[in-house]
Each structure stands twice: as C-alpha cells, then as structure tokens.
Regions:
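Glycosyltransferase-associated regions of secretory-pathway enzymes
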Residues: 1-163, 180-380, 398-559
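Short aromatic-hydrophobic micro-motifs that form the base-stacking/packing surface
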Residues: 176-178, 394-396
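Small-residue hinge/turn detector
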Residues: 162-175, 381-391
Length: 559
C-alpha cells in the first residue's frame, strides 16, 4: 500500500527530476506504477500531467542537490600535487557579508575541495545580526566548512593577521589560500596540478590566491619577495592577476581569471547581464540564467480570502469597510475568519448574513519552533503561513481596503504574489509586507518563509514581520512574483506606493491614483479619522473618505 506518496521520476534524456503528487487517494498502487511507466515512455505531459488527470506535476527546484556545482571527470583524481584543502583567514571582529559568502560558496562548488577551513582572529557569530546571516548558512549547507580560531601561539601580527598566517599554513601542510573577497571567473582546479601557483591584484598589494605543496621552495622564495614588495612577473614566473570589481556592471573583467568583490548583495546579481552575473547566479541559485519567475505548481491561486482575529472585539467601522471591500470588490468564493470567535457587533452581524463568511476556530499560537510569540501580529504571521501552505488563497489584514478585482492578477498563474514595504530597514535593500499575500497551496515561497521562522526572535517586531520574508525572497526569488501595485502602504495617513521612485521617503506622501493604480490600500496606523463611524465618513473629505464612500456604494445584497 502506498499512502500520501510523493513520487520523483528521473528523465534520463533531460537529466531532470520531476515530481508527481496524487491529488486524491494514493492507496492505488497501480496508479503509481502507471505514472512510472507513462513517464518512462515519455507519454506523460510535463505541463499538465495528462494521461491521468488525477495527477498533477510540479517542478521541484530543490531536487537537484548539485545545482551550481562543477562536474568532475575521473581525471581530476590523478596527477594532483597540491592537497585539496582550502583556507581563509578572517581578521575582523564582525560576521561575514554576502561577498564573502559568495566567495566561499564559489570555492566549494567550483573547486570541490575536501574541506574549507575558515580561520578567525575573533569569535564571530551572526546570532544578533539583522541582515548578514551568511555565516549560519555556510555552517548549515556546506558539509566541509569548519571554523577555527587562530592559535594563541601565533605571534606575527605585526605583518597582519591574514595572509601571513595563511602562508605559514601552506608552508607547513600545503593547500590553497583564497582571499575572503576572491571570486573565480574560470575553473581553477588546474592549479592543483602545479606545485605552486599565485595570483595578486595588479599592483601586487594583495594576494588573491596561492596554491602550494608543503615545504615548497618556490613558496619560500615568494614570501621573501612579498615581504620586500618585489613581486612582479619577471621574478614570479606564471604570476596571475585578479582585478577588483568596483562596480558589478563592469565589463572589462570578462576575460579575467578571477576578481575581488566589493560591496554586493543578491538582488544585484538576479538580472545582471555579465560573465560575473551568470557565474554568481550559478553559485547562489544553481542556474546561470537571469532570474525569471515562472509557475512551479499548476492552476491558479484559489479565490478564497483568509483573515485572522483573536480576542474580544466589537467590529468597528474601519474593519467593516475592510471586510465589505473583500466581499464586494474581490468577490471571493469564501472568506474564512480564523480565530477564537470573540469578534462581535452589529457590523459583523450584517456581514455574516453573507454565507460566504465562515468562522474557523483556532487556538492562539503561543510558540513557534519552541520560541515564545509575544506580539499578537506575529501570531497572525504564524497562522497565515500555515493556512496558505495548506489551502492557498488570499490573506488580508484588517486594515486593508480592496479597490479593484484581482481576477486578472491571479489568472497569471504565479505561485505566490506579494509586494515590498515602504519602510527602510537597516542593512536591507528592501523589506516585505505580508499584510496582503496571495499563494497557491503548497507554494515553495510559503514553505521557505515558514521554515525561516526557526530564526524567530521573540522581542524583535520588525525582524520577524518584514525582514525574514525579504530574506526568503532573496534566497528563492524565482518562486515569488513581486507586484508593486498589490497594496499601497500608508503610515500616519501618508501613503507610499512602491512603484513611485521616492517611495522610501516615508516623511512625504507620494501621489497615485487609487481608482486605477492599485489593488488595495493598507492604511496601517492610525485608522483614518473618516473611518471612525458612518457619520464621520459622511462629513469627511479627502482620499480616505472617497475610498470609504466608494466601498459603501458597492452593491451588497444585505444592505
């Protein structure tokens, strides 16, 4: 008997794993066997799963465990002089940045070393970091990566912590040293077949990499030259150069063997049209192609809306407008209100007459991955991840008013749809607001975001709410469509559409046409005075008053 089966089929002709998941009852072993047979015959439609319509297909981007890795011929095992060990030395009392992570991952995937030893002068960690989690990612994704403190006996700090210790290691045991901002543009595995290879920046001020056998006379000679600042091609045969990449759009480095990275973040490489961009994407995402968002799962996002409410509360007029906008503008099949059922009041009683409004009892989540949830808003985050992963649909906060239908948007087939926040966060190029979030059930982004909550910080409101979602987007950008018109964020009645070039200036409102530019408006804090009650709305003017009156004019059967 085969229960709840997730079946992976490998296509020899394309070297691609395909995932087939049964939608109904997987107890029928004959159906499973038929899937394998049909796939082997090439008869199963890879887009629809037709041949057996009770099956659907999804391309799982994480099945290929070796994405971005160089393949190794057997000849790589022979005629190597240099030990297959890579060394880095980190002299700063802070954690690493993305450029350092990219350097180390490039070494791991392209050089395929036995191990990478990362020597540090200080005990570093990224436990309290907001953006730079790259060290933790190395420690959990690179099996051969290890960290070691510089030995207390090391007494040559007058020369600098970094290269001099590395030279001492190579002189003793051999191997390969890479600068912590080094990035190869071509395969460097050939250097292990030479007893000594070195590359520097063009002025020879900085060593890019050194590969050496232990006790090498050429290495000893080079060390003397480097101390005396006499490194030049005439004295160092076969000397290679690595250029510094001051700007990621530089094209003069296309034919270089290697480069040194300056400040860089993942979003800069997602669509970068250059040799470096292609290689960086291969290392980061396992595919050199520019990031393109395509559906992984079949069908479209379900036209159902999820909302969350806990606690004894009389539904106020602002909340009424929000839910009414969902029922009349979005016009969903169902609206599920998840919570403890303590929401009440005349406005709720009116809206409950619509049988599309359904209450789903749920206990208040108090922990996630064993960590206490303090903020009520974070409890909503936990629930929306769980609900959307299970059922899909549209999540909407209680301070979101919908302005136009979403049918065309969800018909495009994207697995997940969201948009950036207007609020700048230290160290972040952008942040993400999930007050409006659309997703198919089982969407990859939602699962990865839920997984990221293992890093939940109980007392850090913004980290959990808008920073972690961005980190998920940064790591899996191909799984999510960023729709800048999905919601306009407002704060203290000033609105900041993310499609406006100055949207990050939250002290000044940016203009937009609410009647046609956006799907929804998210007024956050405070509630507009016009929404205090019906009388206030009737006597108010301005954009928020116009929006409120627009919602009241929408046809509702139970008015």
């Amino acid at each position: 008997m085969v229960c709840g089966l997730l079946l992976y089929v490998f296509d020899i002709s394309t070297n691609v794993y395909t995932t087939y998941k049964h939608l109904e009852d997987d107890t029928d072993e004959n159906k499973v066997i038929s899937v394998i047979e049909e796939s082997n015959k090439g008869k199963l439609n890879r887009e629809t799963g037709s041949g057996d319509k009770s099956l659907y297909l999804s391309r799982d981007y994480n099945i290929d465990l070796f994405k971005g890795y160089d393949e190794l011929p057997l000849s790589e095992l022979e005629f190597n002089y240099v030990p297959n060990e890579i060394y880095y030395v980190w002299c700063y009392n802070r954690t690493i940045e993305f450029k350092n992570y990219l350097s180390i991952m490039a070494a791991w995937k392209l050089m395929r070393p036995d191990s990478i030893t990362f020597y540090t002068k200080y005990s570093i960690t990224d436990n309290n970091e907001h953006y730079n989690f790259w060290l933790s990612e190395l420690l959990t994704s690179v099996s051969g990566f290890k960290m070691e403190k510089l030995p207390p006996s090391w007494d040559r700090d007058e020369h600098g912590c970094g290269i001099w210790f590395a030279l001492a290691v190579l002189e003793d045991v051999g191997g390969i040293y890479f600068s912590t901002d080094f990035f190869p543009l071509k395969s460097l595995r050939f250097i292990r077949k030479n007893k000594f290879t070195v590359a520097t920046t063009k002025n020879a001020n900085e060593i890019s990499f050194i590969s050496s056998i232990p006790k090498s006379e050429r290495l000893k000679s080079f060390i003397k030259l480097y101390k005396n600042k006499e490194v030049r091609p005439a004295l160092v045969p076969g000397l290679h150069y690595c250029e510094k990449l001051f700007n990621v759009t530089m094209t003069t480095i296309e034919n270089n063997l290697c480069i040194h990275l300056e400040k860089i973040i993942p979003v800069q490489i997602m669509h970068l049209n250059s040799t470096f961009g292609s290689l960086a994407r291969k290392i980061m995402y396992g595919d050199s192609q520019q990031i393109k968002v395509q559906p992984i799962l079949p069908g479209s996002i379900p036209k159902i809306v999820h909302m969350v409410w806990f606690g004894f509360k009389t539904m106020n007029f602002a909340m009424y407008l929000c839910l009414r906008s969902i029922l009349t503008v979005v016009n969903p099949d169902k609206v599920y209100i998840h919570g403890d059922g303590q929401l009440h009041g005349k406005y709720l009683q009116k809206l409950k007459k619509d049988n599309r409004v359904i209450f789903v009892y749920r206990e208040i989540p108090r922990h996630v991955f064993g960590k206490q949830i303090i903020y009520m808003q974070h409890r909503s985050d936990i629930i929306r991840a769980d609900i959307l992963l299970k059922y899909g649909g549209i999540y909407s906060d209680w301070d979101v008013i919908w302005l136009k239908p979403i049918d065309e948007l969800i018909s495009k087939g994207y697995d997940t749809i969201l948009n950036f926040d207007h609020m700048p966060r230290p160290g972040y190029p952008d942040s993400i607001n999930l007050g409006v979030l659309m997703s198919k059930p089982g969407a990859h982004f939602i699962k990865r975001w839920q997984d990221s909550l293992v890093n939940y910080r109980s007392r850090d409101f913004f980290f959990n709410a808008i920073e972690l979602p961005y980190k998920t987007f940064e790591r899996y950008p191909h799984t999510v469509h960023v729709e800048s018109h999905l919601q306009v964020m407002c704060y203290f009645l000033k609105c900041h559409p993310t499609f406006h070039p100055d949207f990050r200036n939250y002290n000044v409102p940016q203009p937009f046409d609410w009647t046609k530019d956006v799907y929804s408006i998210h007024f956050t804090h405070p509630d507009p005075p016009a929404y205090a009650n019906e009388s206030a709305l009737q006597n108010s003017t301005g954009m928020f008053a116009d929006i409120g009156n627009f919602i009241l004019k929408q046809h509702f059967e139970y008015d």
